[in-house]
């Protein structure tokens, strides 16, 4: 086995969550790696894992990997710089087995941003004009990044709607989340499944097996993002063994 990859319990480290609940899952994963002894270990998690109280958890992870014979590097990567039409920041743990004497890996991605207007689907899920969401959407202005911004600005500072991001034609789309709404700024509606699939870099013929497209994509790492990391692991590490 050349490498082992995991996306540890993301819900434990949601961005914006005040209290980070630490899980033993990552350490269970490391215990398995200790038995399998792969050349390379790759783990992925949300940005929140390197923020606040979770920093101590990260240090414990690095220490445990060191104890089982691995040197670990941590990278905060943005999918938008990796050929993915989405501003999705994720933390990657890359660990190499010490006995292989591999040099540290360097990850630097600077691909051209892909804006929503470059692939926008003409179809979308129309809003019900009788809903509060539609009435609030009508009050949007260019500087609003989410429905929450619109609500706060027009409803005396009320804090609501911040999980409903606007998708603007001249911007790289926000992170696809498993919940909330992804609202089009240009027309009164939410993103089509085709758009969500494109933004997540999934193939258009992907079989979601009846599950919500937004939920599946929101819980996944963009395949193209993973491919870019894997490519560098091959070039900088595996090809040198």
Segments from the language model and where they lie:
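Conserved active-site and SAM-binding loop architecture
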Residues: 1-241
């Amino acid at each position: 086995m050349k490498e082992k990859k995991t996306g540890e319990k993301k819900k434990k480290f949601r961005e914006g969550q005040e209290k980070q609940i630490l899980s033993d899952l990552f350490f269970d994963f490391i215990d398995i790696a200790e038995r399998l002894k792969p050349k390379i270990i790759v783990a992925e998690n949300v940005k929140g894992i390197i923020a606040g109280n979770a920093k101590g958890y990260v240090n414990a992870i690095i220490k445990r990997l060191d104890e089982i014979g691995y040197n670990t590097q941590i990278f905060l990567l943005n999918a938008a710089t990796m050929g993915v039409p989405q501003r999705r920041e994720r933390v990657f743990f890359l660990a190499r087995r010490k006995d292989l004497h591999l040099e540290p890996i360097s990850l630097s991605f600077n691909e051209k941003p892909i804006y929503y207007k470059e692939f926008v689907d003409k179809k979308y899920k129309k809003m019900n004009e009788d809903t509060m969401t539609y009435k609030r959407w009508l009050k949007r202005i260019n500087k609003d990044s989410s429905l929450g911004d619109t609500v706060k600005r027009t409803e005396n500072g009320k804090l609501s709607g911040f999980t409903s991001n606007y998708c603007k034609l001249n911007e790289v789309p926000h992170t696809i989340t498993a919940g909330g709404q992804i609202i089009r700024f240009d027309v009164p509606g939410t993103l089509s499944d085709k758009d969500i699939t494109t933004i997540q870099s999934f193939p258009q013929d992907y079989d979601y097996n009846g599950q919500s497209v937004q939920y599946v994509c929101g819980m996944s790492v963009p395949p193209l993002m993973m491919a870019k990391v894997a490519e560098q692991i091959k070039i900088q590490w595996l090809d040198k063994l």
